[in-house]
């Protein structure tokens, strides 16, 4: 499984945060990983570890997103866009294995696949502001 596919699985799990109580997310993660029958144990562990790292920093990530958008708050954003931003901001700010350009490009690709018509440009703009403010 390539990094893009792993990232997409992390996105799908992170998306559940918006709809599940926090205390149920560990069970949700286990159920999701159980369904990935073709995934290797190392891939499942990568997904689990990265999800946990992002979930731990969600509040800090949301603060960075809120500071980068004018007239928007994470509470008003579409859930798909917010989830993509959370994943990408984590990669830009804390994941040294992922180059910034790759994180942004992958986020835009996820937005094209799962978001609305304006999602790719919105995601690109927010991430650009975050990267430029570093």
Question: How would you describe each model-predicted region?
Answer:
Residues 1-120, 124-134:
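N-terminal interaction/assembly modules
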């Amino acid at each position: 499984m390539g990094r893009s596919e792993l990232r997409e699985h992390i996105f799908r799990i992170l998306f559940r945060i918006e709809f599940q109580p926090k205390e149920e997310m560990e069970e949700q993660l286990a159920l999701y990983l159980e369904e990935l029958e073709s995934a290797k144990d190392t891939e499942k562990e990568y997904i689990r570890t990265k999800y946990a790292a992002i979930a731990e920093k969600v509040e800090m990530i949301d603060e960075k997103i809120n500071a980068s958008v004018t007239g928007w708050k994470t509470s008003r954003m579409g859930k798909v866009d917010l989830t993509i931003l959370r994943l990408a901001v984590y990669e830009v700010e804390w994941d040294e294995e992922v180059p910034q350009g790759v994180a942004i490009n992958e986020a835009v690709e996820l937005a094209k696949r799962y978001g609305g018509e304006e999602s790719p440009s919105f995601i690109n703009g927010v991430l650009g502001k975050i990267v430029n403010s570093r």
